[in-house]
């Protein structure tokens, strides 16, 4: 397991060896020797795991390795931090800088030679302890080979493997949909041990077409062991999907739970609703929720999932408690073979016999079976016996526990994949994780190495897909064939947390205890009080500080906590900064965090960035989403490493060349016109936001050609009220020479369509998602899509909420849009006449 850390440090040493400063100081050779020794030790660690050595001697040796790996990282990072700090100083400090540089150079030479002596001592101890030999692999980088294999793999399957729950689904659907007045079951509780499939069953019911049609509105929330009633209520309100984003921001400011209860009660009163409350551990959680849910016997239902029978049967007098059973062997085998044999062309009797022996020992627990099958699906057939033998050595009570299967799966991961999985321990229990954010964090942490053929973000996505394929992570939401959000089962999360603690990988803040001095990351899930962040012991070796959770009123962050100089990741989403009594300004001290790669200030009300932001030349991601628009000039031109800029920059936004830029959401048309579009070759996600409230004097004529110059552009959103779209290039937005070879999603908001734009748009070769929101059809009465048009389009959404010229008719020819699965026409367009093929009528939604 420690190999995850040593592998990471080896990659970091490799990056520093490229720096010519080390060669000038005469320390490069020493660092090369250090790397060679650590590479050998990295291999010995794999040997310790392979031989399943768990004796005290091996544990002590691996602890020594972990300590020195972290010390190597600290020495290198601290030295280069000082170099960067000195490079920012000018004028009278020049002489002091020269003296300081000489002192720093002397110190790092001594530090590296001390580390070299320590690592040689560790090597001698290995021989004394009798830890086995290691043959370093030759040839092409294993990680690169595996990443390319993943790239060629089929896309993630959206269909969840649900076996043995068919009867449960039928029984509970009857309960949910029944009109029988004698059936007073307002609450349905599903209970059973962890890993049986309670959430999977509830999700199956929640997504049922019959259920969607029966209820006016639905909501899903989770509770978990550490819960706050406030967070649960906010999640229910958001999940209902009937409250605007602006209203949600106001709701988050409610100070008392009672205010939220009254608000939710008002939303649901008179409606036929369904609410799923997942993973309840404490009966008080339901008691605090039920006051907010009207029980007027209009057919509304609440589904509760829990491991505890007393909660399932005792929540209410009208409860129907449904106990989940273990799978039969036949069901277990069906679940297993669907995944385990998916990559095997021919399954012989010996392989079946070996598989059945292992499945029997899983005792009918679905989670253990899917993790085991995920492990074996990646093994060659001759390796199955090795897995079986290893399982037999680890049997507990003559059965395979989920922890046993997980240990085997984790053990054989490459170190990069181990780090990615351990990062799931950062997130709260039952938390829905946005994959885009997770990818940005993994890259910023330095866990991802660039492949010859792929960008780091694509490599990170491959790792997440592999964890999904191994059944260690659940794909929650999928769009355009990509996992957009995911979740980890709480049992697997517990195992990830256990391993993360052993490695000092992360500490989840607890006001009763402090993390160790070498812990690399600290994460806060709940604020105990608003000012707790102001008065805390600072761990100067920390690389990441994250607040992840629901915003609870106002959480203040004192600027003294922003002086952790080695930070690579700072995520303060949902908190407020205290900076000279101005809460919408990021403190100047942020410019001292020159190692920073990720700055998350979403939902913080920050709308002004200080000039010191220019010091963050290694910054890769700036996430200011959910904040008020940045009205003043924002200068990011010196941030040459920027890959992702997220926020509403309505004033002038200076980007520089932007050669590394992949995400730009969102800037004004004026700022876009100032960029050199030819240099934006890596840009994949672009949003232009022009609104009369902010940019009357800054609006400039645009042409679709400017958007087509970044050839890798996949997502384009234009929110430009009252702008016109036609085939003429002299208009504000023209469709002349449209050429988007990679575009997958196009959203137009507030655009005036002067003519039928579909003939031009339907030629986009990879377009899967087209949204026309609040568009004005002033020059169009009939919009038509011809045969063969939109060959890959899966979703077409047309809506109009404000007053304007609507559309009389939408015509779709017989062979058009062969891939379509969703056609939405809503708002003032509900009266639009649809002339469409019969095959598409099942996909139409008018709401």
From Swiss-Prot:
Q: What does this protein do?
A: Potential disease resistance protein.
Where along the sequence do coiled-coil regions lie?
Answer: 24-41
GO BP terms: namely:
defense response; response to other organism
What is stated as this protein's family in its record? Answer: Belongs to the disease resistance NB-LRR family. RPP13 subfamily.
Q: Which residues bind ATP per the record?
A: 192-199
Q: What is known of its domains?
A: The LRR repeats probably act as specificity determinant of pathogen recognition.
Task: Supply the name of the protein.
Answer: Putative disease resistance RPP13-like protein 3
């Amino acid at each position: 397991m420690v190999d995850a850390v040593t592998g990471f440090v080896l990659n970091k040493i490799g990056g520093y060896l490229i720096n010519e400063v080390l060669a000038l100081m005469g320390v490069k050779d020493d660092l090369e020797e250090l790397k060679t020794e650590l590479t050998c030790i990295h291999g010995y660690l794999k040997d310790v795991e392979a031989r399943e050595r768990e004796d005290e001697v091996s544990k002590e040796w691996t602890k020594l390795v972990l300590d020195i790996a972290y010390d190597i990282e600290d020495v290198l990072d601290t030295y280069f931090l000082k170099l960067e700090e000195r490079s920012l100083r000018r004028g009278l400090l020049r002489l002091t800088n020269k003296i300081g540089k000489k002192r720093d150079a002397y110190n790092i030479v001594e530090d590296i030679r001390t580390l070299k002596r320590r690592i040689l001592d560790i090597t001698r101890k290995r021989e004394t302890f009798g830890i086995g030999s290691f043959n370093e692999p030759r040839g092409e980088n294993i990680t690169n080979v595996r990443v390319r294999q993943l790239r060629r793999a089929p896309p993630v399957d959206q269909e969840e493997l649900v076996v043995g729950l068919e009867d449960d689904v039928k029984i509970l659907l009857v309960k949910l949909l029944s009109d029988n007045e004698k059936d007073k079951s307002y609450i349905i509780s599903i209970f059973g041990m962890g890993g049986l499939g309670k959430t999977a069953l509830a999700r199956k019911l929640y997504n049922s077409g019959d259920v969607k049609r029966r209820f006016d509105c639905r909501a899903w929330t989770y509770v978990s062991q550490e819960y706050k009633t406030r967070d649960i209520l906010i999640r229910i309100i958001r999940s209902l999907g009937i409250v605007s984003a602006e209203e949600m921001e106001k709701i988050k400011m409610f100070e008392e739970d009672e205010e939220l209860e009254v608000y939710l009660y008002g939303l649901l009163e008179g409606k036929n609703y369904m609410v799923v409350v997942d993973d309840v551990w404490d009966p008080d959680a339901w008691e605090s929720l039920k006051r907010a849910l009207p029980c007027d016997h209009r057919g509304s239902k609440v589904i509760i999932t829990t491991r505890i029978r007393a909660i399932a049967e005792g929540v209410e007098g009208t409860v129907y408690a449904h106990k989940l059973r273990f799978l039969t062997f036949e069901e277990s085998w069906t679940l297993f073979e669907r995944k385990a044999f998916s990559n095997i062309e021919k399954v012989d009797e010996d392989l079946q016999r070996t598989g059945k022996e292992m499945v029997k020992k899983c005792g009918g627990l679905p989670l253990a079976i899917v993790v085991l099958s995920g492990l074996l699906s990646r093994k060659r057939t001759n390796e199955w016996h090795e897995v079986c033998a290893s399982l037999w050595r680890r049997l507990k009570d003559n059965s395979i526990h989920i922890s046993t299967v997980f240990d085997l799966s984790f053990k054989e991961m490459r170190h990069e994949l181990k780090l990615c999985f351990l990062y799931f321990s950062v997130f709260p229990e039952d938390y829905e994780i946005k994959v885009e954010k997770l990818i940005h964090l993994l890259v910023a942490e330095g866990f991802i190495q660039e492949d010859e053929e792929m960008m780091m973000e694509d490599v990170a996505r491959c790792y997440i897909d592999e964890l999904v394929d191994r059944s260690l992570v659940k794909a929650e939401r999928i769009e355009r064939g990509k996992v957009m959000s995911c979740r980890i089962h709480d049992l697997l999360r517990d195992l990830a947390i256990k391993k993360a603690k052993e490695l000092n990988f992360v500490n989840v803040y607890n006001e009763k205890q402090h993390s160790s001095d070498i812990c690399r990351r600290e994460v806060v899930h709940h604020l105990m009080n608003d000012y707790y962040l102001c008065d805390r012991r600072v761990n100067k070796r920390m690389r990441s500080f994250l607040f992840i959770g629901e915003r609870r009123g106002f959480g203040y962050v004192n600027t003294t906590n922003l002086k952790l100089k080695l930070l690579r990741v700072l995520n303060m989403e949902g908190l407020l900064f205290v900076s000279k009594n101005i809460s919408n300004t990021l403190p100047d001290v942020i410019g001292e965090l020159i190692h920073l790669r990720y700055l998350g200030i979403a939902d913080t009300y920050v709308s002004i960035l200080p000039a010191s932001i220019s010091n963050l030349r290694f910054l890769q991601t700036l996430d200011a989403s959910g904040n008020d628009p940045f009205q003043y000039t924002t200068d990011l031109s010196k941030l040459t490493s920027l890959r992702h800029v997220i926020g509403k920059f309505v004033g002038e936004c200076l980007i520089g060349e932007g050669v590394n830029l992949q995400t730009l959401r969102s800037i004004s048309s004026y700022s876009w016109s100032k960029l050199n579009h030819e240099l934006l070759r890596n840009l994949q996600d672009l949003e232009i936001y022009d609104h009369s409230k902010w940019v009357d004097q800054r609006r400039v004529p645009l042409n679709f050609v400017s958007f087509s110059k970044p050839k890798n552009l996949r997502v384009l959103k234009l929110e430009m009220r009252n702008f016109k779209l036609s085939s003429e290039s002299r208009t504000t937005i023209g469709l002349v020479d449209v050429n988007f070879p990679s575009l997958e999603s196009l959203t137009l908001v507030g655009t005036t369509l002067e003519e039928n734009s579909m003939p031009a748009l339907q030629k986009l070769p990879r377009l899967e998602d087209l949204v026309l929101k609040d568009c004005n059809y002033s020059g169009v009465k009939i919009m038509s899509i011809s045969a063969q048009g939109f060959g890959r389009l899966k979703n077409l959404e047309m809506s109009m909420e404000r007053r304007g010229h609507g559309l009389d008719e939408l015509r779709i020819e017989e062979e058009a849009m062969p891939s379509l699965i969703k056609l939405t026409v809503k708002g003032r367009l509900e009266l639009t006449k649809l002339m469409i093929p019969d095959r598409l009528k099942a996909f139409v939604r008018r709401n």
